[in-house]
Amino acid sequence: MPKINTRTRIMITTSLLTFLFLLVQQYDFRTIWPINLSFDPIKPFILSFVAYILCYWVLHFKVTGERYVTILLFPAISVFALSLLSEILIVGILSDFGQLGLVLLSAIVFWVFVYITYLTVNVLNVSYLREIPLGQAGRASQFILTMIIAYISFFLVFSNDIFLVFRELFILFETFLLVYITLWTIKISKRQRIIASLNIGVLISLLTFILSLWPINSTYIALVLILVFYVCLGIALEIREFISQFIWVEYVSLLVLIFVILFLLAEWGINGHLL
């Protein structure tokens, strides 16, 4: 039997997941397990589970120990967030666009995003085993994908009527996982990764609680959270090295932007926005 190379495996896996994505759109699993939600949350769980298993195959089963979390879980989280966003868009937000057209458009975006995710995971896995020139590019790609996943998750959490406690727990858990997976790519101890991930997770969840009470649109809440997350994760990744003055200026500028967003775009009673 001819050996299938990694690039071909990624193509096959991405296509299979996209086909499954299109297939599950034909079913409503809420009829099996009654859930009082406007969208079907079972589909993203199915897709993310399959993504986790297929990632193991893509990497030729060369995954052991901690990488079952740091490597295999990353595409699963990516697929979950993207498929959940697509599910919500398809069933409601953009229904005027035409459901068939939106499904096909979502499938194309899904394929591209998943393909890039698996390529990134493969580079990170190989760079863990040995030093390769693409290692830095893989880490940069993962950072960008993490920001996209986090923003999608923050937006979905605040744009849906979710009980505050569940919202806080979800934000804490996902932020912890995303930070831990990202910090795994640099050479720090497991204890340092856990502490940094927990600190950032608690900070983001506390900010989530505050913003839940702030009179601002869910889109801007997600933007504020992702800016804070970007600063925190950036500092955590650079903590081993000297952080240049230029980077500190960037982070301070983002913090100023956050305060501007919070005060100028908030809806203050009958007067509305300050702008």
Annotate each language-model stretch with its function.
Residues 1-16, 247-249:
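N-terminal membrane topogenic signal
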Residues 35-51, 99-113, 160-173, 217-228:
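Structural signature of hydrophobic alpha-helical transmembrane segments
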Residues 53-67, 116-129, 177-189, 233-243:
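C-terminal ends of transmembrane helices
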Residues 65-78, 133-142, 191-200, 224, ...:
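Cytoplasmic-side transmembrane-helix entry/capping segments in multi-pass membrane proteins
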Residues 75-83, 200-204, 221-236:
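Hydrophobic alpha-helical membrane segments
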Residues 81-145:
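Hydrophobic alpha-helical segments and helix pairs
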Residues 237-257:
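Interfacial loop-to-transmembrane junctions
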Residues 263-275:
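Juxtamembrane boundary at the C-terminal end of a transmembrane helix
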